[in-house]
């Protein structure tokens, strides 16, 4: 049951905060509609070109799927080392500056700035992290597995008694 006009429009049956149903009379045969102030309508008209930048969600999805997302193992290692190094450097600089200035807030700000900077450098898959692509094995044919399961030796472990 909707309480307190949760449906967004003053319709005939609404409920109060106590949960009791109240009947609201419609005014002179007008349909039940939501009131929108003129400022809201003006704002919606101004924002329409920004919302319609991509004609459909499929076009937007195609654009996003064309961005590279993979990162090789050496790139991941480099990103992790850079991330830790930047945070450690910002923590040391922040601690020293905060100690000299006797302001703990500056220490926190400097460490937060270092964290944001390291995230900007390491989270996106920049080309520096994709220099060593993986070499995949070729696809094997299914015809090589003609052996019966009975031909295989069963490996048994020694008992630990």
UniProtKB/Swiss-Prot annotation:
GO terms for cellular component: endoplasmic reticulum membrane; signal peptidase complex. The chain crosses the membrane at residues 86-106, 108-128. Keywords: Endoplasmic reticulum, Membrane, Transmembrane, Transmembrane helix. Residues 107 are lumenal. May be phosphorylated. It comes from the Eukaryota. Residues 1-85, 129-161 are cytoplasmic. One of its GO terms (molecular function) is ribosome binding. It is found in: Endoplasmic reticulum membrane. It is a multi-pass membrane protein. GO terms for biological process: signal peptide processing. Component of the signal peptidase complex paralog A (SPC-A) composed of a catalytic subunit SEC11A and three accessory subunits SPCS1, SPCS2 and SPCS3. Component of the signal peptidase complex paralog C (SPC-C) composed of a catalytic subunit SEC11C and three accessory subunits SPCS1, SPCS2 and SPCS3. Within the complex, interacts with SPCS2 and SPCS3. The complex induces a local thinning of the ER membrane which is used to measure the length of the signal peptide (SP) h-region of protein substrates. This ensures the selectivity of the complex towards h-regions shorter than 18-20 amino acids. This is Signal peptidase complex subunit 1. It comes from Mus musculus. The gene is Spcs1.
């Amino acid at each position: 049951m909707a309480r307190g006009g949760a449906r967004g429009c003053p319709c005939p049956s609404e409920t109060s905060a106590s949960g009791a149903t109240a009947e609201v009379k419609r005014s002179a045969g007008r349909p039940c509609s939501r009131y929108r102030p003129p400022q809201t309508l003006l704002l919606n008209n101004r924002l329409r070109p920004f919302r319609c930048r991509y004609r459909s969600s499929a076009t937007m999805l195609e654009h996003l799927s064309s961005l590279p997302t993979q990162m090789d193992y050496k790139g991941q290692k480099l990103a992790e080392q850079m991330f830790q190094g930047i945070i450690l450097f910002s923590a040391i600089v922040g601690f020293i500056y905060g100690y000299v200035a006797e302001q703990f807030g500056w220490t926190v700000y400097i460490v937060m700035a270092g964290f944001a900077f390291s995230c900007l450098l390491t989270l996106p898959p920049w080309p520096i992290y994709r220099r060593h692509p993986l070499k995949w094995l070729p696809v094997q044919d299914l015809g090589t597995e003609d052996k019966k399961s009975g031909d295989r030796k069963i490996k048994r472990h020694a008992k630990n008694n």
